């Protein structure tokens, strides 16, 4: 036998080991980025995700159903940062909402539907859009475009998990007129992702389903949002500990029914700094705890974008969050920065 025989056999053995490892090793797919589909989808679900994305990016015109009142010409025109399904902070991404609140009336919240509310559009295919009527007890609110990443997980939370947390820091579920629990929207005014997503076609673009957009295209858009991945988060055990220590996790619950949402999906009274408009049973100072999803991708903070930083957003919290803010302020400067750094990484 030649001297090269054992060496050749060793090389072949090494090659076979490498090939076996490649064949049996789990996929090393990179973590999902903003706008990517979540892991574990079937081929059929991935197909619906891609087809839904195409509808999400479709530009509408008056000839294809836009109007007569509208805020923008496509879903992605507002939800575009840093990818389709993201947030928006340009002037044309800001909505104006208005309603009238009177605690002595029944119902207490008048959403001004007879006047074109509660969403007052900035564009009309002809003439001028309705203006907010002058009125006593009027609340006007600005709304930035919130990201849609990971919203499909909210649909997976059972009502019982939301109701079980009622009373924690004064939170309460938003019971809708039909008895269901609201969970979507800044005031938790919609019960399902289906309703929340399809309503946007009418509220933002004046597009009626199924007369101006097919029911199938509407459902594809819902599935696109449902299958959007939760953006990856930065690991920070020390920051997470301080986040819990000051009590932020009392409302921004890290896992609700095992979904990593950082919300309790309850309404909380956040004090006069947050007062603007009512919606359904939600009073002007009450807001659903915002899920802390994709915070690192945001440019402005809070429902109206007034906060330029996470620290400013924390300090504007009042009402049922006052004690939490006080504990945050009692931290050392380094500890406060650690909490901010943690939230910025979510």
For every predicted segment, state its role:
Residues 11-21:
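Bacterial N-terminal signal peptides
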Residues 22-346:
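Periplasmic c-type cytochrome electron-transfer domains
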């Amino acid at each position: 036998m030649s001297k090269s025989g054992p060496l050749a056999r060793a090389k072949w053995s090494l090659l076979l080991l490498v090939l076996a490892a490649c064949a049996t090793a789990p996929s090393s797919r990179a973590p999902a980025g903003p706008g990517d589909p979540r892991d574990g989808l079937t081929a059929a679900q991935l197909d619906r995700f891609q087809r839904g994305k195409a509808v999400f990016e479709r530009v509408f015109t008056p000839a294809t159903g836009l109007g007569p009142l509208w805020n923008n010409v496509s879903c992605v025109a507002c939800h575009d940062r840093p990818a389709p399904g993201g947030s928006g902070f340009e002037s044309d991404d800001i909505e104006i909402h208005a309603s009238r609140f009177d605690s002595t009336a029944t119902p207490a919240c008048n959403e001004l539907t007879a006047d074109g509310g509660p969403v007052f559009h900035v564009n009309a295919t002809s003439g001028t859009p309705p203006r907010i009527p002058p009125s006593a007890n009027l609340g006007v609110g600005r709304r930035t475009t919130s990201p849609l990443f990971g919203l499909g997980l909210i649909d997976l939370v059972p009502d019982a998990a939301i109701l079980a947390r009622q009373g924690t820091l004064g939170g309460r579920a938003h019971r809708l007129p039909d008895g269901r629990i609201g969970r979507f929207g800044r005031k938790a005014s919609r019960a399902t992702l289906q309703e929340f997503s399809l309503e946007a076609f009418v509220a933002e673009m004046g597009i009626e389903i199924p007369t101006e957009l097919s029911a199938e295209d509407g459902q594809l858009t819902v599935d696109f949002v449902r299958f959007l991945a939760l953006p990856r988060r930065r690991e920070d055990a020390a920051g997470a500990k301080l986040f819990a220590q000051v009590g932020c996790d009392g409302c921004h619950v890290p896992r609700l029914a095992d979904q990593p949402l950082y919300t309790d999906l309850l309404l909380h009274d956040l004090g006069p700094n947050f007062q603007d408009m009512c919606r359904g049973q939600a009073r002007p100072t009450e807001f659903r705890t915002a899920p802390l999803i994709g915070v690192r991708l945001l440019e402005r903070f809070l429902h109206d974008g007034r906060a330029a930083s996470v620290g400013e957003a924390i300090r504007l919290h009042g009402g049922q969050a006052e004690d939490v803010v006080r504990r945050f302020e009692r931290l050392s400067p380094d500890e406060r920065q650690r909490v901010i750094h943690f939230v910025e990484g979510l």
